[in-house]
C-alpha cells in the first residue's frame, strides 16, 4: 500500500491551481466533472502516483489557530535541499510563515499557508532523524 492523495476542499480553483502549479511547480494531471458537466475535482500530480485533490465547493473555514483541535493539521512535502527549495519558491512569490528550523524529529522544516489557509510543511529529512532511521531498516 502507498499514499495516493490528499483531498482539500477549495473555494477558488483558479487561485489554488496557480499556487500549486505555478508556485510549487506541480502539474495539473486531470479533471473530474459532475453529471451536469460542471467541474468537480482537479488532480494535481506531486510525485510517483501521489496527488493533491482539489475539490470544488469550499465555504468559509475556521482559521488554523488551535493546535489541540482534532483533525487535519497540515500536509508535508519532503525536499532534498530545504534552503534551495525555499529560495526557489520565494522567487515565485510563495510566502513562508516561518524561517527554516530544526524540528524535534531532527529534520529541517519550514511552514507556510496556501491561499485558502491550508497549512503546509516542507521537510528536509536529517540523517539522524527517526524518519531516516526507519527508512534505512
Residue ranges and their predicted role:
Residues 38, 71, 106:
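Exposed loop/turn and edge beta-strand positions of beta-sandwich/beta-sheet ligand-binding modules
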Residues 75-78, 82-89:
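Mid-chain, well-packed structural core segment of small domains
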Residues 86-137:
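Vicinal oxygen chelate
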Amino acid at each position: 500500500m502507498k499514499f495516493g492523495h490528499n483531498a482539500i476542499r477549495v473555494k477558488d480553483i483558479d487561485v489554488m491551481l496557480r499556487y500549486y502549479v505555478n508556485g510549487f511547480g506541480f502539474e495539473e494531471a486531470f479533471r473530474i466533472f459532475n453529471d451536469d458537466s460542471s467541474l468537480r475535482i482537479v488532480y494535481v500530480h506531486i510525485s510517483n502516483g501521489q496527488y493533491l485533490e482539489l475539490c470544488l465547493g469550499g465555504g468559509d473555514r475556521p482559521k488554523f489557530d488551535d493546535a489541540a483541535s482534532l483533525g487535519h493539521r497540515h500536509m508535508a512535502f519532503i525536499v532534498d535541499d530545504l534552503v534551495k527549495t525555499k529560495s526557489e519558491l520565494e522567487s515565485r512569490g510563495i510566502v513562508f510563515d516561518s524561517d527554516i528550523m530544526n524540528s524535534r524529529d531532527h529534520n529541517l522544516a519550514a511552514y507556510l499557508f496556501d491561499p485558502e489557509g491550508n497549512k503546509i510543511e516542507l521537510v528536509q529529512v536529517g540523517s539522524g532523524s527517526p524518519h531516516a532511521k526507519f527508512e534505512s531498516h
